[in-house]
Swiss-Prot record:
Its main location: membrane. InterPro entries: UPF0324_pro (IPR018383). The keyword Transcription does not apply. This is UPF0324 membrane protein SPy_1056/M5005_Spy0779. It is found in: Cell membrane. The keyword Cell wall biogenesis/degradation does not apply. Belongs to the UPF0324 family. Keywords: Cell membrane, Membrane, Transmembrane, Transmembrane helix.
Amino acid sequence: MSTHLRKLPGLLLCLLLALPAWCLGRLFPIIGAPVFAILLGMLLALFYEHRDKTKEGISFTSKYILQTAVVLLGFGLNLTQVMAVGMQSLPIIISTIATALLVAYGLQKWLRLDVNTATLVGVGSSICGGSAVAATAPVIKAKDDEVAKAISVIFLFNMLAALLFPSLGQLLGLSNEGFAIFAGTAVNDTSSVTATATAWDALHHSNTLDGATIVKLTRTLAILPITLGLSLYRAKKEHDIVTEENFSLRKSFPRFILFFLLASLITTLMTSLGVSADSFHYLKTLSKFFIVMAMAAIGLNTNLVKLIKTGGQAILLGAICWVAITLVSLAMQLSLGIW
């Protein structure tokens, strides 16, 4: 059997799991399709007996379909629009990202958490949730159970943010503009940002959704420097002495991140020439669906019992990151006079 045909059963299995997960994600956006895909994959893995037939396809999906999803994610980014509208929130974005990464780095040893999981929780909390985890996992060569753990933690605090932040913003007396920046900088995933801003708009008859989404998209651009930095750090760590002979920037930097940037540039150029942003809608949707497929594959490769037993430290780290990001976002708004 050819290599491509050997991958087909695993690909089809991931596709079959992704379809109901996608539908469930549409019904319950506060949870999201990627989380449903991981859960379905982990549940099936408990009693699935045909791993030899599907192993190659599942592995291909969790790696290459995931990388393709990240590339297609770039078609949702108009760099001109993001930079024009998002510049006001840039100091807050930089502060919250730096805070989460420092917290994750500082607490990893204290919590006795593996480096990859701590990195994924920090990156996912600070940048763009599941998409950031998807982009970072191949760079640091994270295992599937580490990815599943990080996604689960991020989902938990996404849900809490969507439920609590509208009331918190009202209690603190945030303006509509202030809440848009707060939601865009302190909530992890795009779907949760949308849910949080929509809940605020329903309470206040406002339109914070557009502003929150653009702030969130500005955060997404941090994928580029963060993944580059992590890939260089990992490459240097794997070599005791970095010389021209044993270190190559081209080999260290993941190509799919370069294609992500290229996709963003294409979107920016085409929209500046008058092409409607809606023209890229199908590519953005395909990106989201590929992430769901990849999460199904990751779920299939994850031991649910082990995840439950070892997930406590990751949840604690996620909680500390979440609280730290929330406080820094609000403090920066106050200091900049936006609040």
